[in-house]
From Swiss-Prot:
Family the entry assigns: Belongs to the bacterial ribosomal protein bL12 family.
Molecular function in Gene Ontology: mRNA binding; structural constituent of ribosome
Gene Ontology cellular-component terms listed: cytosolic large ribosomal subunit
Species this chain originates from: Clostridium novyi (strain NT)
CDD domains, per the entry: Ribosomal_L7_L12 (cd00387)
Upper taxonomic lineage: Bacteria, Bacillati, Bacillota, Clostridia, Eubacteriales
Protein name: Large ribosomal subunit protein bL12
Length: 121
């Protein structure tokens, strides 16, 4: 049986048949199909970093077009003119906390479009 024939035979197996094959190989060769602990720990840490779902949107710098940034801040946060101006003038300031990833990315894009520098934390 060639390597390609073996791979094709494995592709045609059901999940139960594959499970039985793995167990038979473990018994026959005295090995384990389980991943080493060190590798599993690293994979878990990477997964945890990627799973962050809430972000703080921070205005790091208003840039040169402060009026446009103030308008964008008002639109995105619902703040009044005075409050939005205070945030923009006092940068770096947190605009919103605990924002979903998609909403945070949208806010960042809109504010960067008008010249602001935004950080997601």
């Amino acid at each position: 049986m060639t390597r390609e024939e073996m791979i094709q035979a494995i592709k045609e197996m059901s999940v139960l048949e594959l499970n039985e094959l793995v167990k038979a190989c473990e018994e026959e060769f005295g090995v384990s199909a389980a991943a080493p602990v060190a590798v599993a720990g690293v994979a878990g840490a990477v997964g945890a970093a990627e799973e962050k779902s809430e972000f703080d949107v921070v205005l790091a710098n208003a840039g040169s077009q402060k009026i446009k940034v103030i308008k964008a801040v008002r639109e995105l946060t619902g703040l009044g003119l005075k409050e939005a101006k205070e945030i923009v003038d006092g940068a770096p300031k947190t605009l919103k906390e605990g924002v979903a990833k998609e909403a945070a990315e949208e806010m960042k894009a809109k504010l960067e479009e008008v010249g602001a520098t935004i950080e997601l934390k």
